[in-house]
Amino acid sequence: MKQFFALIAACVLAISPSFAQDAGDDFVEYGVGLAISPFGPSLNLTYNVDAKNSISAGFGFSPEVSAPDALLPDWDTPGGFSATGTSSWMGVFWRHRPLENDNFGVNLGMAAGQIENTLTAGIPFHEGEDPHTYQVSYTENPVMYFGLSYGLKPVKGLQVGVDVGVLSTGGASVEYTGHAEEMEEHEEEIELEMEDIRDNFAWTMLPNIQIGVSYGF
């Protein structure tokens, strides 16, 4: 979690110089942009209702990628787990800019899709065997989103922005996907490892940081 907040701070410092130049630009009704987040790249189409309110439709996906060890939790299970994941989603979001400085915004939204994670044990049950795996799936829809944003003003030209928030989900299902014969032999160990995954990985609230560029027209 410390790495997550450090990443947020670094992103804000890196992109903040690009905002000042837009202050005098004219309001526009439409924007199209690209963004990147832990859930993959996305295409975003925006309609600016007025200078204070925007509605966006987002479409995102991620091919199977490995999670950096630095972003994984401290596991209770000896050896821990490595993780890979895929995702696909679409959502509708409302951004409100309550302050005089239109860079600041509050985002509320609703999305539907799925997130599939495969966790591989660091230590197999038996020496010389392939390590066993678990499937962690978020498939309950819809999910809600709340975030705070900076940038991506509703003005003409290229804009840069960052959004930090959380996805509120119904939780994930955790399934053992290793060899069936090990289920009986190591039933107690498997239950303990699944409990570790539920407590430390399969959260109902998922943090998000999204960095995007958009062109207003």
Task: Give short role names for the model-derived ranges.
Residues 150-181:
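Short, positively charged, low-complexity/disordered linker segments
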Residues 45-65:
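Short, flexible N-terminal segments of the mature chain
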Residues 34, 43-47, 92-96, 108-110, ...:
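Residues on the lipid-exposed face of transmembrane beta-strands in outer-membrane beta-barrel proteins
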Residues 31-33, 59-90, 114-143, 169-208:
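Extracellular/periplasm-exposed beta-strand and loop segments of Gram-negative cell-envelope proteins
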Residues 21-32, 39-41, 49-55, 102-104, ...:
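Outer-envelope beta-barrel architecture signal
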Residues 13, 37-39:
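A short acidic Gly-Thr/Ser loop motif
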Residues 1-25, 201-202, 217:
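Cleavable N-terminal export/targeting peptides
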Residues 133-144, 148-159:
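Conserved, surface-exposed functional patches that form binding/active-site neighborhoods
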